[in-house]
Amino acid sequence: YVGQISRMLESCGAAIAVAPASHMGFLEEVSEQVDLVMTGTPEDFDQLPEKEVEFSPLRPDEPAYLQYTSGSTRFPRGVEIDQSTVLDNLHEIAEHGLKLTHQDRFVSWLPYYHDMGLIGFILVPLICQLSADYLPSRTFAMRPRLWLKIISENRGTISSSPTFGYALCAKRLRPSDYDKYDLSSWRAACVGAEQVNPVPLKAFAENLAPCGFDENAFVACYGMAECVLAVSFAPLDLGLSVDYVDQDLMSTQGLAAPADENSTNTAA
């Protein structure tokens, strides 16, 4: 972890690094390997004396931030996102992908350093002036049912997760939980950031149907850090559409030949 952070800081020429108190030990190790002007917690920076600084308005083609890729196939790369590109993607997500209204409310446990959390659940509700509730990612990993509790109590309408998040919730649910949640408000349960596996998603929908969860709320999404976040959304209110194909033909010839769902040689 320290090695990866060091390489990321070096690759972008960072001068300052900020971390919560819980991660300062890592940052102190990093500072021994990377030449930084200053490191510290947000509270450390708040204590610095203020100075008058004149800011010039940024042009549309100037950088807004660096978004690092997931690093699933190689070392994370910093993608430079300019001002106009991020605003365009935010508009497309709000207007066309999710078709947001003033009645929507976001709920998220996604980490802020990931494009799905940063763009989808911080910047989108921010520019749309919509309410959002946040659950720390670590807390979700330990107590995933809190995610459902927040959606239920605050009448959340938009919430996303990779497939594993839905699978984790379904695994931790008990029959006695069904009376605790009302998920009828959840209209867009986006799925992305990893392979969209229909098996755990169907289990999630079946387990939470007594709580008012509608399987048609599932929205398969595809995104890339290089494109800010969203590349495509499945249509809203239709749920998942799954094609079953012959796995051998797909892997050897690239042919999507229909196959029986229950066959041992089937890929979804």
Describe the role of every protein-language-model region.
Residues P63, T69-S72, F106, S159, ...:
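Conserved S/T- and glycine-rich ATP-binding loop of Class I adenylate-forming
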Residues S72, Q129, A193:
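Conserved G/P- and acidic residue-centered "switch" motifs that form tight phosphate/ATP-binding loops
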Residues L87-R105, D115-T157, R172-S176, P235-L236:
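Conserved AMP-binding/adenylation subdomain of ANL enzymes
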